Amino acid sequence: MSQKQKNTKLLVPIYLEALAVTKPMTASNSGRTWADLSPNFSSFRRRNVPKLGIQFAPVPFQKGATPPDMGVHLHWALPAELTHGVQHLGEAMQFPTVPNRWFVLRIPTDAPDDRARAKAWVLESDYLGRDGTNTFLTYDPKSETFSYLRLGKAFAYGDGPKENQNYLQQLTAIGLGNPLFAAFYPGCRNVFGFHDDLAGIDAGTFSYLVAGWYAQDEDDPLNPADKWQRLKELKSKWNVVDLADDEYPTETLCHGTVHSLQWARNT
C-alpha cells in the first residue's frame, strides 16, 4: 500500500467551553461560596503523616477558597479515546499519552477600539517547574523521596519557551492518578484550560480557537509501530470520514472553537 506524505494531519474536534467573569467575584457580592477542590500535597513535607488520598483532599466549601479571576476562562475536553485506560491481566492500568502542546487564539469579531486585538498563546501542558501552575508531585526512585513542582505553563506566541526546561515524561488524562484531573478546570489550568485576563479591554465580542498536538512524534497515537492496525481501530472509534484505505495521517491535531463571546467589564 502507498502512504500519504509525512505531516498529513487528522483533525479531531474537541468540545471547548468558556466562562466570562466580568467583575470581581467574592462570596459577599455573588452570594456564593467557592469550592477549591484541587489536591493539596503540602502534607508531604511533614513526617509521620499517612500518604493516603484523603490526606490530599481539600475541605469542600472551606472559607478562603479563591473564586475565578476576571477574564475569560477556557476549558476543553480531550477526545474520549484518550481518556480511557486499558488494563491487561497482571499489569497496572495504562492511559494513553495526550497532546502536550496547545495553541490558543483570541479573535476580536466586534470591538469598539484598537485595544481589543487578536492575541495568541502557547501552552506547554507537560512543563514542570517552580513557576508552573498546578501543584504536581514528583518521585525520585533513587532517593525514594517525593517532592512537588508545578505543572503547566503558558507564554505569548512568539516569545518561545526557555532552554533547558524540565518536562513530565508522560502526560495523561488522569495526571497523578486523579480520574477528574482533565475534567476539573481549577486543577488543570495551562494544561487543559487557559485564562485570558483581557487586560486593558473593557468591551468587545470575541471568538477563541484552541488547537492541540504532540510535541514528540512517538507519543502520537497515529505514529505506532503497527500503524495500519491502529488506523483501523481509530477509524472505527473516531468515525474518520473521507479517508481512503491507502491513506494514513501521521499526526493528530485536536481543535475546538467558541464563537461570539460577549465581554463587558464590570457588568
Residue ranges and their predicted role:
Residues 2-3, 13-15, 20-23, 36-38, ...:
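Short, compositionally biased serine/threonine- and acidic-rich segments at solvent-exposed termini, linkers
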Residues 155, 177-204:
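Signal that preferentially marks extracellular ectodomain short beta-strand elements
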Residues 100-104, 199-217:
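Beta-strand-rich modules
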Residues 107-181, 266-267:
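Low-complexity, serine/threonine/proline-enriched polar segments
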Residues 71, 99-101, 189-193, 205-207:
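Extracellular structured ligand-interaction cores
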Residues 88-115:
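Extracellular low-complexity, O-glycosylation-prone stalks/linkers
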Residues 81, 98, 161-169, 189, ...:
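Beta-strand-dominated extracellular/periplasmic modules and repeats
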Residues 1-98, 219-267:
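Pro/Thr/Ser/Gly-rich low-complexity, intrinsically disordered linker/stalk tracts
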